């Protein structure tokens, strides 16, 4: 009788650490996966920001070529940001 009780405790003493290790491995897997996804999203957002900077530079160069103005010159075709001070866009 005592032998059967000890075998049940023996199985429980082995199963509990195994389940604990399995639980922590599963948690580690999902945390690692979330970290990798976050790093990918940060990398993609940086690429998008860099592309937008290049597009802005190209558009500025095209505007300068089309109007023949530089940053220090004013022209009647260029629009001042103050012109849109009270402007509310439609949604």
From Swiss-Prot:
Cellular localisation: Cell membrane
Region: Disordered, residue numbers: 67-91
UniProt keywords, alphabetically: Cell membrane, Membrane, Transmembrane, Transmembrane helix
Membrane topology: Single-pass membrane protein
Record keyword rRNA processing present: no
A single cellular component GO annotation: plasma membrane
InterPro entries: YebO (IPR025594)
Location (main, coarse): membrane
Residues that span the membrane, as ranges: 11-31
Protein name: Uncharacterized protein YPO1740/y2567/YP_1481
């Amino acid at each position: 009788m005592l032998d059967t009780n000890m075998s049940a405790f023996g199985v429980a003493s082995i199963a509990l650490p195994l389940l604990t290790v399995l639980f922590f491995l599963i948690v580690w897997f999902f945390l690692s996966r979330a970290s990798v996804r976050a790093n990918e999203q940060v990398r993609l957002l940086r690429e998008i920001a860099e592309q937008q900077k290049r597009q802005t530079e190209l558009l500025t160069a095209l505007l300068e070529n089309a109007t023949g103005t530089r940053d220090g010159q004013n022209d009647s075709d260029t629009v001042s940001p103050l012109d849109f001070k009270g402007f509310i866009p439609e949604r």
